[in-house]
Amino acid sequence: NKKYYVPNNAILTVAGDIDIPQTKEWISDYFAPIPRGVTIERSFTKERPITETIRAEAYDPNIQIPAIFLAYRTPGRNTRDARVLDVISTYLSKGKSSKLYKKLVDNQKMSLQVAAFNMNNEDYSTYVILSLPLGETTLSTLVAEIDEEVEKIKNELISEKDYQKLQNQFESEFVSANANIAGIANSLAEYYAFYDGNTDLINEELDLYKSISREDIRQVARKYLNTNQRLELHYLPESQKEEK
């Protein structure tokens, strides 16, 4: 696309044991001849708040197993609340000891798969919880079981043990992601592109996550993860449409 794939909308990160003057010369040789594109105007469309549950069905001829998607509108990635939602995602579904996985997949054998994640975007983001049923489990049953776990987060502080586990997980992931030159280069590029050019986040991001408290987790869940603020999508095989 000539509008977006242009030098003035690209980020080049060079990391490593480099000769800086020589590197700048090579960059100029390879990239300077590429013409600048038009200035890109960016706008932020304000959406009306979701105040009632939106229910929808979608049919796909290429799937055999249905799925439930619960989607909530959440704030842009460069906010504290977005980071808190990342923590909630890890608590709910990251790893076999996470609350939803342990409950629905391991213990109750209701689900083939469950996931919770915040799709971070620049303006609004989308928090998604999805699950695939196992056996005779209905999508409505999965919704009820998922909502039960979300309500616990909204009404109770998570345990100190779980909180410390989350802290350790985020520290481990951050260190691992930046353990080599390629990881550092990728982080710097992402911070510049998605966080208003703030590459200092490579030194601050971990502390931002570690500053999130148990009360923050409860308050953010109360603010965004409400049943009247979401889309409830039943994603179904085409054959189920024909049966109706």
Predicted regions: what is each one?
Residues 1-39, 76, 107-244:
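Charge-rich, well-structured scaffold segments of protease-associated domains
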Residues 39-97:
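His/Glu-based metal-binding/catalytic segments typifying zinc-dependent metallopeptidases
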